[in-house]
From Swiss-Prot:
NCBIfam families cross-referenced by the UniProt entry: hisF
Protein name (record): Imidazole glycerol phosphate synthase subunit HisF
Task performed by this protein: IGPS catalyzes the conversion of PRFAR and glutamine to IGP, AICAR and glutamate. The HisF subunit catalyzes the cyclization activity that produces IGP and AICAR from PRFAR using the ammonia provided by the HisH subunit.
The gene coding this protein: hisF
Catalytically driven reaction(s): 5-[(5-phospho-1-deoxy-D-ribulos-1-ylimino)methylamino]-1-(5-phospho-beta-D-ribosyl)imidazole-4-carboxamide + L-glutamine = D-erythro-1-(imidazol-4-yl)glycerol 3-phosphate + 5-amino-1-(5-phospho-beta-D-ribosyl)imidazole-4-carboxamide + L-glutamate + H(+)
PANTHER family linked: IMIDAZOLE GLYCEROL PHOSPHATE SYNTHASE HISHF, IMIDAZOLE GLYCEROL PHOSPHATE SYNTHASE SUBUNIT HISF/H IGP SYNTHASE SUBUNIT HISF/H
Length: 258
């Protein structure tokens, strides 16, 4: 059995790490490189960096900090933000990133997933899915351009359908960003994760809602996700990564202990 992964997420805007609640009202957390170094030292299995306004601004992720991060950490990291071409991806990977993640650009051009997978291999290609539960319809819908609340829009895709589509096109991993839960720290949306797990045959990463160590355990035990991504509980030092992993190990979760 592969070890489960603990993945701090660093949302980047204007060269700094920020964090919002339900993808709104972002506050500045700090500088990118020191945070990345801290999480690596605490025992994170990998890091994810989202340049949250790149796609809505029509630009690619700011590459200047990617190489600086690569110099100070020795764990894998993934970069996302406005990657719309093979050239964009090649540059980011050449600066030291291990994976690239696409979200809004994949919705705009689904063939991008296949072209990237064919060029760089599926192991490098992560598809992020921003999913919102509509209480009126009882359905989960994929959203686009969520880094800028003035441009965020609901797409025609229901979440489960898009999960299946991106796998057909070559996604090697899926990060499910559950917008309703984001930043509120009351637990992952286990019901949604279970539904996605049934149709997801590549590694699945849960994102949005972690507030306690038990929330991580529930995601691994009840929804069988491969990794759990979180931000605010790590940024605000509510949970220490090393202590979290020790707790998960005592609960029978296969996890890499530092």
């Amino acid at each position: 059995m592969l070890a489960k992964r603990i993945i701090p997420c660093l949302d980047v805007r204007d060269g700094q790490v920020v964090k919002g609640v339900q993808f709104r009202n972002h506050e500045i957390i700090g500088d990118i490189v020191p945070l990345a170094k801290r999480y690596a030292e605490e025992g994170a299995d990998e890091l994810v960096f989202y340049d949250i306004t790149a796609s809505s601004d029509g630009r690619v992720v700011d590459k200047s900090w990617v190489s600086r991060v690569a110099e100070v950490i020795d764990i894998p990291f993934c970069v996302a933000g406005g990657i719309k071409s093979l050239e964009d991806a090649a540059k980011i990977l050449s600066f030291g990133a291990d994976k690239i993640s696409i979200n809004s650009p994949a919705l705009a051009d689904p063939t991008l997933i296949t072209r990237l997978a064919d060029r760089f291999g599926v192991q490098c290609i992560v598809v992020g899915i921003d999913t919102w539960y509509d209480g009126e319809t009882g359905k989960y819908h994929v959203n686009q351009y969520t880094g800028d609340e003035s441009r965020t829009r609901v797409t025609q895709w229901e979440t489960l359908d898009w999960v299946e589509e991106v796998q057909k096109r070559g996604a090697g991993e899926i990060v499910l960003n559950m917008m309703n839960q984001d930043g509120v720290r009351n637990g992952y949306d286990l019901e949604q994760l279970k539904k996605v797990r049934e149709v997801c045959h590549v590694p699945l990463i849960a994102s949005g809602g972690a507030g306690t160590m038990e929330h991580f355990l529930e995601a691994f035990r009840d929804a069988d996700v491969d990794g759990a991504l979180a931000a605010s509980v790590f940024h605000k030092q509510i949970i220490n990564i090393g202590e979290l992993k020790a707790y998960l190990a005592t609960q029978g979760v296969e996890i890499r202990i530092c």
